C-alpha cells in the first residue's frame, strides 16, 4: 500500500521547487506502458502544463487537487477555449475529469 500523506506531498513539492519546470511527478505505476498511469504531480506557481490529449490509446484524465489552486481549460479542435474552471479545495472545487 502506498499512502499519500503530508510527508510525500512535502518531499514531492521540494523536488518540484528544485526543478527548472517547477513541477515533479511521483509515479505510483511501475512502467510508462501500464494501462493506467497513476501519479502525484506537484506543480508550483509559474509552471505551465501545455494543452494535450492522449489519443493512442485514448485516455481520460482526472485531476484531484490536494493543495493550492489551478485553472483548467478545455479546447476544441481549433484551439478555442470551450470550458474553464478554477480548482481550489479550500472553496470546495476538488477536481475535474477531462
Where are each of the predicted segments found?
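Short acidic-glycine-tyrosine-enriched beta hairpin
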Residues: 62, 76-98
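Intrinsic-disorder/low-complexity, polar/charged segments enriched in Ser/Thr/Lys/Arg/Asp/Glu/Gln
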Residues: 38, 48, 93-97
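A short, N-terminal "cap"/entry segment at the start of jelly-roll beta-barrel domains
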Residues: 1-37, 83-89
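Conserved short histidine dyad/triad with adjacent acidic residue
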Residues: 40-59
